[in-house]
Amino acid sequence: MSYACPILSTINICLPYLKDINMIDKRGETLLHKAVRYNKQSLVSLLLESGSDVNIRSNNGYTCIAIAINESRNIELLKMLLCHKPTLDCVIDSLREISNIVDNYYAIKQCIKYAMIIDDCTSSKIPESISQRYNDYIDLCNQELNEMKKIMVGGNTMFSLIFTDHGAKIIHRYANNPELREYYELKQNKIYVEAYDIISDAIVKHDRIHKTIESVDDNTYISNLPYTIKYKIFEQQ
């Protein structure tokens, strides 16, 4: 991998040998800050996968998220950072640092959308200038999330199945649940539309597990086990 910036090329070569991937320079910036600033998407991905902390603030209070919005103006970089689950404080601080709340409307909406998942009281923590301008969007986020929290699927809420680590591990088990199917088929969300992709993937996984179970030869040790046990065996694959 080659970069126009010599510093970044050196980082790429030395990365496997670094003792602390989150080391900071005299400006309080990490390698991740610099990779985001220089718009190096592949390097940002590598740093995140290697354990870079997305929550670290520089000496001037800048987060990587704020840099992605104000300097890089790169939505894909922003999405990568949000996928690595920054803290609510990090996101709120990043919103405070946004220099143009009009032109950066899409990036701001991405941050609000993520923050509302973490804490449904987020709206009270968002900078007033942003909360006033994006009030309708915040309300719609709340509406969709509250609806997910009301729907029970087995012993879980739709929200927990979609947005928690535990839910991600078990949602496929509920692929034929009538409440989940109805929610999926209605497709009423305008903001959290990724919920439908998650459910679709869960249905595909469930069907694959079921077909695998059906393909097991009769009169074998596994074939004689209860269906639920066989399901748990094959869902690990």
Curated annotation (Swiss-Prot):
Domain of life, per lineage: Viruses
Keyword Kinase: no
UniProtKB keywords: ANK repeat, Early protein, Repeat
Disulphide bonds in the chain: none
PROSITE patterns per record: ANK_REP_REGION (PS50297), ANK_REPEAT (PS50088)
ANK repeat feature ranges: 27-56, 60-90
Entries under InterPro entries matching the protein: Ank_repeat_dom-contain_49, Ankyrin_rpt, Ankyrin_rpt-contain_sf, PRANC_domain
Keyword Repeat (UniProt): yes
Pfam families: Ank_2, PRANC
PANTHER family referenced in this protein's UniProt entry, alphabetically: CYCLIN-DEPENDENT KINASE INHIBITOR 2C-RELATED (PTHR24180), POLY [ADP-RIBOSE] POLYMERASE TANKYRASE (PTHR24180:SF45)
Task performed by this protein: May be involved in virus-host protein interaction through the ankyrin repeats.
Stated name of the protein: Ankyrin repeat protein 14
